[in-house]
Structure formats: C-alpha cells, structure tokens
C-alpha cells in the first residue's frame, strides 16, 4: 500500500508528463491564457523541436509567445537556464517585462513560482529566478 505522499508524487509525475507533452495546455491551464490555434501549434513545435525558427511580421506576438514558452519551460523542467539573445539589450529585457506585466498579473500560480528576492529587471542586469 502506497503512502499518501507516494500517491501525491505519482500523481504529480503523471501531470508533469502530460503537460510536458502538451505545453500549450499547460499555458492555458496554469497561466490562464487563451491561446489562438496557431499559438498552440507554435508552442508545441517550440517544445518538440531542437531548432525552431519563427519568422513573422510585426504585431503577431512573437515576444509574447517567447515569454510564454520561457515561463512554461522554466516551470516544467526544473533547473533550466534560459538565455535570451537579441540584437540589443532592450529587446531581451522586453521578454522579461512581458512576463512581469502580462503573464504574472493573470496567474497567481506563476507569481508563486518566482523567487522575487533574486529576480531583478533593470537596464544593466535582468534576471527572473524561479524557485524550482
């Protein structure tokens, strides 16, 4: 007979496996974001592809989708280090600001995942640390 703790761990492992295979569902359920069908496909492909390139015109939400993927990846795969490379520092910081201003207010679960004592976003140093 399994203990309650062992049953909880087994259930958590099942949900983690499900959400790792369906990252778009994790974004909707955990971050409380309503994704369009093409965003679901892009998130899924980001997760399963070793190399992913998304070329799109202005206003299609590339930064927003990148922010969603970074957050989902950091939560579902503990101890993941994510580096955002861009042409300028401001463009990279833009992704972190999207996390802070667009994603966190809609998801108390995401807010609880972030270690605010070690996180900072300013002009010279920008980092968001997750508790896991």
Language-model segments: what does each one mean?
Residues 1-132:
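Phosphate/NTP-binding elements of NTP-utilizing enzymes
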């Amino acid at each position: 007979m399994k203990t309650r703790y062992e049953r909880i761990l087994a259930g958590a492992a099942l949900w983690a496996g499900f959400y790792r295979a369906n990252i778009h569902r994790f974004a909707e359920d955990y971050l409380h974001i309503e994704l369009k069908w093409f965003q679901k496909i892009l998130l899924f492909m980001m997760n399963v592809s070793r190399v992913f390139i998304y070329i799109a015109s202005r206003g299609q939400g590339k930064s927003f989708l990148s922010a969603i993927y970074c957050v989902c990846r950091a939560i579902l795969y503990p101890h993941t280090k994510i580096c955002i490379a861009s042409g300028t520092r401001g463009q990279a910081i833009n992704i972190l600001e999207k996390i802070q201003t667009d994603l966190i207010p809609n998801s108390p679960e995401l807010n609880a995942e972030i270690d605010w004592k070690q996180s900072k976003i300013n002009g010279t140093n920008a980092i968001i640390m997750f508790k896991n």
